[in-house]
Amino acid sequence: MNPPTEGKTKQCVSNSVRLIRGLAARFRCALPALYILWSVPFLLTLSWLTPPFQNPDEVNHYLRAVQIARGELAGYRLSGPNWVSPPNSGGHSDPGVITASDPFAHVKFNPQQQVHKSDFRVASSTGFSGNELIGFGNTATYPPFLYLPSVLAIWIGQAAEMTILTTLYLSRAANGTAALLISTLAISFACRTRWVIAALAMLPMTSALYVSASQDALIISLTLLVVGIVDRIGTERRPAAGIERTAIFLAASLIGMARPPYSVIALLPLAISIGSARREFGVVIGIVSCIAAWTIFSTKVASVDMNGADPGVQIAYIFRRPFDLVPIAWRTLTEFSANYFREFIGVLGWLDTALPNWFVHGAGIALAASLLGVCALAPGPRPWLALVIAVLGSGAVFGALYLTWTRPLAPLVDGVQGRYFIPLAPVAALSLPAAPRFIRPVLPWLSMAGIIFLAIFVPAVVIRRIAFRYYLGG
């Protein structure tokens, strides 16, 4: 080989190596746009394909949204002989929502049952018309703010004289659109956590919740946004700008008001404070004040004991025998941890539509690969605090359900679902350390492989599973 030819060959090889090394970086930069391109058709298909009211508590969430759309911003305890046993809370909503959901009730918790044309035909004849006191105790305490996409869709549906079913699909699409846009912002802001935020937003469980009529869609997406903003500030090791502090304040307040166990996210600004933390403390105090105000108000006017729970008895028992919490926690985790993992990845419907084992394990590996990408960069000022927040938040989830959903003296904590830990996962990711320098260039490639796995298999597996579960049988 003559010298000019040899030089061209070396240059070509060098260019190819640089191109390959830069591919993961280019893919990472394009993640926000790629997520939109991936999520829009998938979420719209999922919102249409999932039968009406076959997301967790979707009937009660929709009753709450209709109540807000009618001008009642807060739920309240219902009084009178009809609400004595069991006690309930709710407000004025449309009984047509219950009528429209009844034809699909036979499918809930019954994987052998499929929906039929007659179910849709009966339900589609119901429009908005009534306004009466209805109980929806498990959603009556929720604030109105995160129901805004559904409320807007209900206003449009009522103005256009749509049926309740058509308006429900519109509400799902509105919720999904809002959640995917917020998630895209979160991916755009994130530095270290960009891979894992994208992976969490693509999980089957997250996607299903994004296109439900519940507030979970915005709880998850707003948490991703808070983590993305905190991640960027911490990675760049600079003070937070005023608009960033405002965004964190608003988002974290809405998250904690909607689900008090996530109130610990209010502490995240302290994980990135540099020098004097006066401004960050101010943000934290403001967030905690908003959460406390709504929690006290909603507990006073709308909270009722459910599922045989009695918080007073439970608290007295804890004070009397605090060390009994250790075996209760141990039994709960050993009994249900595998279920929590499956539900975190995705058990659809009313926890009655499981996904194949190979896919659940593959998605778990893909999620772990996305976490490795976090280790390609150095962490922010106080990564340990993010871990403390995630652990405290997880404990708060168990504690809240032990008090409000578990029967007194029960040996296990009842009512915990894997999806409750999705908002805490990106917080935990902030705590991961940087990997040794020699391995860092490989990590983005592993994360990219995980994202590609999710992008290919999540739509294929989820759509096929829903089609066979609800329509085709088997």
Locate predicted features.
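Interfacial juxtamembrane loops and adjacent helix segments
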Residues: E72-L170
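Transmembrane-helix signature of polytopic, membrane-embedded enzymes
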Residues: A160-L165, T184-S207
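Perimembrane helix-loop-helix junctions
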Residues: I229-T246, S263-I291
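Membrane-lumen/periplasm interface segments of multi-pass, membrane-embedded glycan/lipid transferases
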Residues: I285, S298-L377
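Transmembrane helical bundles and short interhelical boundary loops of multi-pass, membrane-embedded
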Residues: A293-T295, A302-I318, V416, P441-G474
